[in-house]
Amino acid sequence: MKKLSLLLASLCALFLVACSNQKQADGKLNIVTTFYPVYEFTKQVAGDTANVELLIGAGTEPHEYEPSAKAVAKIQDADTFVYENENMETWVPKLLESLDKKKVKTIKATGDMLLLPGGEEEEEGHDHGGEGHHHDYDPHVWLSPARAIKLVEHIRDSLSADYPDKKETFEKNAAAYIEKLQVLDKAYTDGLSQAKQKSFVTQHAAFNYLALDYGLKQVSISGLSPDAEPSAARLAELTEYIKKNKISYIYFEENASQALANTLSKETGVKLDVLNPLESLTEEATKDGEDYISVMEKNLKALKQTTDQEGPEIEPEKEENTKTVHNGYFEDADVKDRTLSDYVGNWQSVYPFLEDGTFDQVFDYKAKLTGKMTKDEYKAYYRKGYQTDVTKINITDNTMEFVQGGQSKKFTYKY
């Protein structure tokens, strides 16, 4: 149904664009962005060279957004369309199929950034029935100041490549903004590096990258809405969990109702605060001078109410134990003798990718997640295991061909 609605919107947009296809009279670029962080970062880089438009305003859930015909028309009439990642704006891949690439340049803000595995997010405070939404990969990279810098850098480089006559301006604007983000990053590093409590509990599981980059552990909690009190049964469960783990604060993505705060405080002693996922910024907040940096500063202040207090590591309320082969689960029927034909194909050695830095993000993640080795130690470890002078292996039904330095040797496999 979503694909059909997007197709109809695209068809309608063709007519709308035909009627409104006029470039900016002031000679500026016309850039359309999806949601707030992308808008803010693009605006900071483009500066006075462009009119930057925000597609998804406050009050609209970016995860659930589907573009109208009017929205598609805006994108198709733009010089550049900037989005964050297809795991956030799930409608974008379908849109790009019908977009005139010669006319509209597109920028994926995350570029080739490696994303963490995603999962189910439960946000019962929204108007979509509390069903949550699933990401194959977690797109919330903007909530780590360190990664926000990388988003800005990629937007800068992409705009510079597309509009080389404006490259100097883009670089100057980006440098000024990145300097502010670096101050923010340092504030997070200094404020959280000596955290007495490394775990924090949140109703919106959007802070994985923030936790990863600053040495914390996000623990998400389900069954809580900021504007409704939990059932008696759920309240009993929460009371036991909160007291067992000595939880002082639970973070919501928006201000919780006073009734909920009073109920939880009375039953458990826990306090409620806000960690803003910055998916949007209200007009009122903008008028008050709020922006990405000021909101992230407030998030840090809120986090420190937990991290500055001594406390035990907080365990997840419900430990997930998915039965997958990766986790050591398989049926006897899954075990079978395999023939060479099961592996037919042209296989590439991963060693060159290790050497050229392609895997560096993987080693960085692994180092932060496990704490067992540094990223450089992981790279050295895998270099030793993966090193080979065979660049390719080509497999047919019963032959294996090893390619090495432009020469190849073929062998027949006997089962």
Segment roles from a protein language model:
Residues E377-Y415:
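Contiguous, well-ordered beta-strand patches that form the walls/edges
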Residues A206, L224, K368-K384:
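Pocket-lining segment of extracytoplasmic ligand-binding domains
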